[in-house]
Amino acid sequence: MIRHLLSVITLLVGIAMPAMGQIVTIERSTQEIADSIRAELDSRPYFSLYKDTYFVGGTVLGGKPSEYNSDVKIQISFQQRLTKSVLPFHTYLYLFYTQKAIWHVFRNSLPFHDLNFNPGIGLSKHIIMKNKLVGKATLMVEHESNGKDGTKSRSWNKISLAAEAYIAPQLMAHAKYWIPIVYGKYNKDILDYSGIYQAGFQAISNDNKWVLDMTLIKRRGWNLNFNTVVQLGYRINHNSNQFIMLQYYNGYGEYMMDYKQYHSRIRFGLLIRPRFFSDF
């Protein structure tokens, strides 16, 4: 009798132990889950795309196209992460570089009209709440100039604070505010045209084929004066980060040389996007 009772107890313990082990494995603390999310993000390549990279050409909207109002705009942008999320408050450090070119391909000799250089360094923190990645906050120091001298020189340095909110897996809202710390001699009024802050969103279709961006850049002053950028892209194939893109720009400050000139441009071409949401 005792022997049979011990056999039953042994069997019950054997059944219960795996279940107890499963409970211990599943019940992880909030901190452990947050750490695992950071570890997954830190495991991604150190070198990656930053802002959108594109090659688009087009002309003025609402006017007669000519060699003087038609052009090609090129942007390349990348980042190099310097650390993992091991700095205070789980932040990480990275370098970034963006270059923009305006190319007058419809004129004789095909001259480049302007080249804008935008290097910088940033300190970012992924924001994790309720066991989910919900956003990112970044403090950065940026330089932007066009590499020219004399009266054609345009440059400024600024401290920027940026934030991203991942509202849904396919929707991100973003905002960025900057404080200039050094102006170039010939562009001291650049805030009146290139703005003081921006806000926008990026939406991706459920089938990951379409991407829509809209950014509003507020120019200095109390009036409702914005520069507007809208981009619509269609993925070339399912496994590619290349898109066919339509881009619309309306306002001032599209590039540094002619930052005081109003532009309304529609362009079409190739877009190359980061794996996740783009930076702005």
Language model regions located:
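Cleavable N-terminal export/targeting peptides
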Residues: 1-38, 277-280
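Short glycine/proline- and aromatic-enriched beta-strand/turn motifs that initiate or cap beta-hairpins
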Residues: 22-84, 121, 273-275
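Intrinsically disordered, low-complexity linker/tail regions enriched in polar/charged residues
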Residues: 23-26, 31, 145, 181-183, ...
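Predominantly the C-terminal beta-signal and adjacent terminal strand-loop region
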Residues: 26, 37-44, 227-280
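Outer-membrane pore/translocation modules
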Residues: 49-57, 84-206, 214-216, 223, ...
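Conserved aromatic-histidine-acidic binding/catalytic patches
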Residues: 63-66, 70, 109, 151, ...
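Membrane-embedded beta-strand positions in outer-membrane beta-barrel channels/transporters
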Residues: 71, 75-77, 118-120, 160, ...
